[in-house]
């Protein structure tokens, strides 16, 4: 048991190393796949690795500061539950990761009793609320377009379409106050100050998923009202539970119920269709845009369909390339956006490299 505790409640323990390894693997796998399918990596510098560290560290410092200043102690059972749930979620992060399950940690205190247990349960609700509010902020202000990657899919009729994948994890190391009696004689990285013991806890925020029904960055952004609302509700509940006498059972069940409401909302949201990108007979369909290229300067987006280039109609990459050669230092496009609107776009082209527009098209059609 002591070894399990030491592995789980340690900012640089099992959760950290597994998350770091997965983040590196996600990033390298993404660039390798893009080079195989599209002949280039859309984002070759692996920005998701740097963000794993610095964004998570900032978030961890802010949340820890609130918990320490407020002297909001958490039970050891809740800490173990949070770390254990994080570890389980990591095992499934290849397919999907979303920290909706944080509220389930409240159930770890079932069987406890007394005023101290009630305070710990209320404090846990506040902690989970803060983490969900942070997740809402990350989703709302995300720059997921920098790590969004198109994935080619085929239906039963062999028609090609594009899904969009986003894999971004944030390591959030927390320093949390725990009652001294909870951690005595346990192998923890802990510091005791004035009857409070501060213990390190590794958590993860972020998202990993693939969707054929929307851009990945906008799909993640749509989750922020859910997380923001749930986080606000839990913080208010935790404050009320600390100042009023509420049954312990309510404080144990309420965060778990909110977690289930969250995941139900995400399942419903995931079934909504906002964008479908399929290979078309007319025009050339974009499924990605390389940053800092003429395509990016023109504001092109996945789902846009190029109908004409330099006043020549185009229906495939060969026709697009030939049209670019008509005016090798400038590019004028007529395109239909994903919302159906027609617009014109134009920009200068890199001198001596008219083929490097930065458009990612369906395989064998990259320009």
UniProtKB/Swiss-Prot annotation:
The keyword Transferase does not apply. Residues 261-339 form the PDZ domain. One of its GO terms (biological process) is division septum assembly. Coiled coil: none annotated. It holds the Pfam family PDZ_6. The chain crosses the membrane at residues 2-22, 49-69, 72-92, 97-117, 119-139, 186-206, 226-246, 248-268. Keywords: Cell cycle, Cell division, Cell membrane, Membrane, Septation, Transmembrane, Transmembrane helix. One of its GO terms (cellular component) is plasma membrane. InterPro entries: PDZ (IPR001478), PDZ_6 (IPR041489), PDZ_sf (IPR036034). It is found in: Cell membrane. SUPFAM superfamilies: PDZ domain-like. It comes from the Bacteria. It is a multi-pass membrane protein. Belongs to the MinJ family. The main function of the Min system is to promote the disassembly of the cytokinetic ring after cell division, thereby ensuring that division occurs only once per cell cycle. MinJ acts as a bridge between DivIVA and MinD. May modulate activity and localization of MinD and MinC through direct interaction with MinD. This is Probable cell division topological determinant MinJ.
């Amino acid at each position: 048991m002591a070894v399990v505790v030491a592995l789980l409640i340690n900012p640089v323990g099992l959760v950290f190393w597994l998350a770091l390894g997965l983040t590196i693997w996600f990033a390298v796998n993404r660039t390798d796949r893009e080079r195989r399918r599209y002949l280039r990596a859309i984002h070759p510098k692996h920005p998701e690795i740097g963000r794993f560290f610095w964004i998570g560290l900032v978030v961890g410092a802010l949340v820890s500061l609130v918990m320490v200043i407020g002297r909001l102690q958490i039970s050891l059972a809740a800490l173990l539950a949070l770390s254990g749930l994080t570890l389980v979620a990591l095992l499934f992060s290849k397919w999907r990761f979303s920290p909706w399950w944080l509220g389930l940690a409240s159930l770890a205190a079932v069987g406890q009793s007394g005023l101290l247990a009630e305070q710990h349960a209320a404090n846990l609700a506040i902690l989970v609320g803060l983490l969900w509010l942070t997740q809402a902020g990350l989703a709302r202000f995300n720059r997921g377009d920098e790590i969004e990657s198109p994935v080619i899919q085929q239906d039963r009729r062999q028609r090609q379409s594009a899904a969009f994948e986003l894999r971004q994890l944030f390591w959030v190391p927390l320093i949390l106050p725990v009652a001294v009696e909870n951690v005595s004689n346990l192998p923890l990285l802990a510091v005791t100050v004035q009857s409070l013991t501060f213990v390190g806890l590794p958590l993860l925020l972020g998202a990993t998923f693939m969707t054929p029904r929307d851009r990945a960055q906008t799909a993640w952004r749509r989750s922020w009202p859910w997380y923001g609302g749930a986080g606000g509700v839990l913080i208010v509940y935790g404050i009320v539970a600390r100042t009023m006498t509420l049954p312990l059972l309510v404080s144990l069940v309420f965060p778990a119920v909110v977690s289930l409401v969250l995941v139900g909302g995400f399942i419903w949201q995931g079934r909504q269709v906002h964008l479908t990108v399929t290979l078309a007979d007319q025009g050339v369909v974009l499924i990605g845009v390389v940053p800092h290229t003429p395509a990016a300067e023109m504001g092109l987006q996945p789902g846009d369909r190029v109908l004409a280039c330099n006043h020549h109609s185009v229906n495939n990459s060969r026709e697009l390339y030939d049209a670019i050669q008509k005016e090798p230092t400038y590019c004028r496009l007529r395109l239909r956006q994903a919302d159906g609107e027609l617009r014109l776009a134009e920009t200068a082209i890199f001198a001596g490299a008219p083929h490097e527009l930065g458009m990612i098209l369906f395989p064998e059609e990259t320009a």
